[in-house]
From Swiss-Prot:
ATP binds at G618, P619, N620, M621, S622, G623, K624, S625. This protein is involved in the repair of mismatches in DNA. It is possible that it carries out the mismatch recognition step. This protein has a weak ATPase activity. Keywords: ATP-binding, DNA damage, DNA repair, DNA-binding, Nucleotide-binding. Residues 805-826 are annotated as: Disordered. It holds the Pfam family MutS_III. This is DNA mismatch repair protein MutS. Transmembrane segments: none annotated. It comes from Halothermothrix orenii (strain H 168 / OCM 544 / DSM 9562). Residues 805-825 have a biased composition (Basic and acidic residues). PANTHER family: DNA MISMATCH REPAIR PROTEIN MSH1, MITOCHONDRIAL (PTHR11361:SF34), DNA MISMATCH REPAIR PROTEIN MUTS FAMILY MEMBER (PTHR11361). The gene is mutS. Gene3D superfamilies: 1.10.1420.10, DNA repair protein MutS, domain I, MutS, connector domain, P-loop containing nucleotide triphosphate hydrolases.
Length: 896
């Protein structure tokens, strides 16, 4: 260390305190990184790796980024899971005696981002904690960009509930206890959710309790509802302690903590959120194609974040649901007012994140201008709320603070279009400060004198090319070309010689320069001081502004739901506690939104007694999965307070939705398709209650037919049994044997309507009572484009299996070993002559050809092949072509 240069000694002493972070060390206009940090930065950020003398004749690897563009580089490092410690110069280098003092002012981690450029407008950025305490587990999370802070406690230490909550909020970073890390599935879950984690450091509940009391400046946590929840206190205390260590400041905008219970909301585990595609799609993890994409017509960023919460946490209290629905209905019935409110919301910026920056002391004048524009809209919104009469809107109106005083302050003080920098003036309006006005007047007078100097000096000297200019090095000057140097007055003093001219000053010019530049410096300093005072006043009012912001967010979501109801013909659901779910002409909100044609609606009836377990049979691609998801989404939408895509809907409140939809090998955990499926089924039968809604799309497919059927049968009996679960269930299956369960109380058979005619099989996507007569698997394979050879061979095998099945029924034997084997040539010989040429072509790799689905196309081919085209007259040929075209159009086909 003694061999290091003073600057490198300073660097190393600071780096030793922050070994787990990449240290951005401020040197002038750059952040420099040294040694291993430099190597990491060069690799991850594609920077040039250079070197700097560190003393003792040795060089230290070095890489740097400009301060003005550092955010983009920091964002890339955070995305890759690194922490970044920002080390600033804390004194003016021009005033420093010796080495400039430096210290770390903030540690930026993935879960502690406040910079708008690194955040998505309509998504939260959470830091979470999951801490074990005795037989409980505390769970807490915060978004420091908005100030939202939540906490809860689980009665089971290693419950899957913690993983479901982590999946719901999708945190960027998690603080965990080592006990949780040692659980069997931790590594797999972390990999799936992709979060950075840190270890907890608080051992005593008392210490965590004191951290919270100190932060909230209170004597008790009773007002926050977590006084008697030690595990929750530990989890919340860990977050506050972490923020204290990393952010190096008090965060006034985190001024309350909300204690919640999972039982206050419908439970949606990670599998259900995934299968129902609530906020992102299964394929590609995209926003478009999700329920959120359909429902989110919010105008503000705050509303966008809130509607996502409502989707992920539907209500289970009937009164609360009805309160939301009343509000949405009132907006639906007041179209003009709805549009007026939405127009007013367009002027509202992201108040929550502006307050986060104000709390940090990083808000600039543009942030305060955005706050000003937003607050100036509030009186209009207050008047809008006054015109609404439902309970929720009345409460919102009564508690809505239009912040008139702050609006006046910001409107008087902050210019309409301020610069980004707060140190270079141009922030404060004329008339706000008399002292500032005097300085500006002096500056203006000085500049006017200097501006007139060029004219007066040209007249006085007779030098028409004389110029008055300014640069930062020499200040103001008079420039005269060399051809006119003999005419320079005696009171001019030479300042600088150029190739073609010389620059001079005069005593009067220096005096005015001192006045102007002195005034400029004083103006900039005074404007900054005034700005900081205004920002501090805003900081003192954070609680007030946050309450108003929360009302605006809720209003935005309610207007979004009302707008959706009007545009998409959604209707208000009736909510009950008796368990009846009745949907008339229900539609899938996402499929309908993305589809090109008219969506086929379906009815649904479920109750807790006579029709609680619905077995749905029918072919693949007929709409069974879409129908079941549709029912689940309609229930979820109703309980979040939304109108629903149905002509009528009665929703018996559901405490939890379970889905077991499809399955594939889980490569991250090494589990087979069948194991994944059985884990999901086990989760359902172990956690479902009588008030749950269960969606089962095939059970038992990943094993042998008899094993699968046996499991599906037993699971059906168990779920349907009121003494076990007795939950409302939709079960789609290809095991037609399960339809025999209809003789059990509570079980009903339904199937998808299929129409057969001379043109083939038509899937009508209509759910009707009764069991399916056939599976139509070969027809679906044909629709998918399998070669004709396979289709025809499958039909022959099916015929033989069905024949042997009938024979086994008579003889009591069920074996089907003697299925005939036929060669390709045998098959082709059995095909109708008119199709041989087509089938031969199908064996090529021509991907453009599509398998004809309907029999009408074969007849068209037959007609064309049998026609004596050579001997046809032109008119006969045209008429024949017209007949062919007409026939194809009537069948709705596009034959190529």
């Amino acid at each position: 260390m003694s061999k290091l240069t003073p600057m490198m000694q300073q660097y190393q002493s600071i780096k030793n305190k922050y070994k787990d972070a990449i240290l951005f060390f401020r040197l002038g206009d750059f952040y420099e990184m040294f040694n291993d940090d430099a190597k990491i930065a060069a690799r991850e950020l594609d920077l040039a790796l250079t070197a700097r003398n560190k003393g003792g004749g040795e060089k230290a690897p070095m890489a740097g980024v400009p301060c003005h563009s550092a955010e983009s580089y920091i964002a890339k490092l955070l995305e890759k899971g690194y922490k970044v410690a920002i080390c600033e110069q804390i004194e003016d280098p021009s005033e420093a005696k010796g080495l400039v003092s430096r210290e770390v002012v903030r540690i930026i981690t993935p879960g502690t981002i406040i910079e708008n450029e690194m955040l998505k407008d309509k998504e939260n950025n959470y830091l979470a904690s999951a801490i074990c305490y005795k037989d409980h587990l505390g769970f807490s999370y915060v978004d420091i960009s908005t100030g939202e802070f939540y906490v809860t406690q689980f009665s089971q230490k290693f419950s899957d509930k913690v993983w479901d909550e982590l999946d719901r909020i999708q945190p960027r970073e998690v603080i965990i206890c080592k006990e949780l890390e040692e659980t069997e599935n931790f590594a797999d879950k972390k990999k799936q959710m992709n979060f950075v984690y840190n270890y907890s450091r608080i051992e005593k509940v008392k210490a965590a309790y004191n951290f919270l009391l100190e932060h909230f400046k209170t004597n008790s946590l009773s007002g926050f509802g977590c006084e008697d929840k030690p595990a929750a206190i530990l989890a919340a205390g860990e977050i506050i302690n972490f923020l204290k260590d990393t952010q190096k400041r008090t965060l006034e905008h985190i001024n309350r903590i909300t204690t919640y219970n999972l039982t206050d909301y419908m439970v949606l585990d990670s599998a259900t959120r995934y299968n129902l595609e609530l906020t992102s799609t299964i394929r590609g993890n995209k926003h478009k194609g999700s329920l959120l994409n359909v429902l989110d017509q919010t105008i503000t960023s705050m509303g966008g974040r809130l509607i996502k919460k409502w989707i992920n946490q539907p209500l289970i209290d009937r009164n609360k649901i009805e309160t939301r629905l009343d509000a949405v209905e009132e907006l639906v019935n007041n179209y003009l007012l709805l549009q007026e409110i939405r127009e007013h919301l367009k002027g509202i910026y992201d108040l929550e994140r502006i307050l986060g920056k104000v709390s940090y002391g990083s808000a600039n004048a543009r942030d305060l201008a955005a706050l000003k524009y937003s607050i100036l809209k509030l009186p209009q919104i207050k008047k809008d709320l006054e015109q609404l009469n439902t309970k929720l809107f009345k409460n919102m109106h009564e508690t809505f603070d239009p912040l008139i005083d702050l609006a006046g302050l910001l409107d008087r003080s902050i210019v309409d279009e301020p610069p980004v920098s707060v140190r270079e003036g141009g922030l404060i309006k004329d008339g706000y400060s008399s002292e500032l006005d005097e300085l500006r007047k002096a500056r203006t007078e000085g500049k006017d004198w200097i501006a007139n100097l060029q004219k007066t000096e040209r007249e006085r000297t007779g030098i028409s090319s004389l110029k008055v200019g300014f640069n930062k090095v020499f200040g103001y000057y008079i420039e005269i070309t060399k051809a006119n140097l003999d005419r320079v007055p005696d009171n001019y003093t030479r300042k600088q010689t150029l190739s073609n001219s010389e620059r001079f000053i005069t005593p009067e010019l220096k005096e005015k320069e001192a006045l102007v530049l002195g005034a400029e410096e004083k103006i900039n300093d005074l404007e900054y001081k005034l700005f900081v005072k205004i920002r501090d006043i805003v900081r003192d009012n954070i609680k007030r502004i946050k309450k108003t912001a929360a009302i605006i967010s809720k209003l935005d979501v309610l207007t979004s739901l009302a707008q959706n109801a009007l545009e998409r013909d959604y209707n208000r659901p009736r909510i009950n506690n008796d368990g009846v779910i009745e949907i008339i002409k229900g539609r899938h909100p996402v499929v309908e939104d993305m589809g090109k044609g008219a969506f086929v609606p379906n009815d649904t009836y479920l109750d807790l007694e006579e029709e609680r377990f619905i077995i749905i049979t029918g072919p693949n691609m007929s709409g069974k999965s879409t129908y079941m998801r549709q029912v689940a989404l309609i229930v979820l939408m109703a309980q979040m307070g939304s109108f629903v895509p149905a002509d009528k809907a009665t929703i018996g409140i559901v405490d939890r939705i379970f889905t077991r939809v499809g399955a594939s090998d889980d490569l991250t955990t090494g589990q087979s398709t069948f194991m994944v499926e059985m884990n999901e089924v086990a989760n359902i039968v172990n956690n479902a209650t009588r008030n749950s809604l269960i969606i089962l799309d095939e059970v038992g497919r990943g094993t042998s037919t008899y094993d699968g059927l046996s499991i599906a049968w037993a699971v059906s009996e168990y779920i349907n049994n009121p003494d076990r679960i007795g939950a409302r269930t939709l079960f789609a299956t290809h095991y037609h044997e399960l339809t025999q369960l209809e003789n059990r109380p509570g079980i009903k058979n339904y199937n998808v309507l299929v129409e057969e005619d001379e043109d083939g099989v038509h899937f009508l996507h209509k759910i009707i009572p009764g069991k399916a007569s056939e599976s139509y698997g070969i027809e679906v394979a044909q629709l998918a484009g399998l070669p004709m050879e396979i289709i025809i061979r499958a039909q022959e095998i099916l015929a033989e299996l069905e024949k042997k099945g009938k024979e086994s029924t008579k003889t009591g034997k069920g074996e089907n070993k003697n299925i005939s084997h036929k060669t390709e040539s045998d098959l082709i010989n059995n095909i109708h002559e008119s199709d041989k040429e087509y089938l031969t072509k199908r064996n090529t790799n021509d991907k453009v050809q599509q398998l004809p689905l309907f029999k009408s196309e074969y007849r068209v081919i037959e007609k064309i092949k049998n026609k004596d085209i050579v001997n046809m007259t032109p008119m006969e040929a045209i008429n024949f072509l017209f007949e062919i075209q007409k026939e194809l159009k009537e069948k709705g086909e596009n034959y190529a």
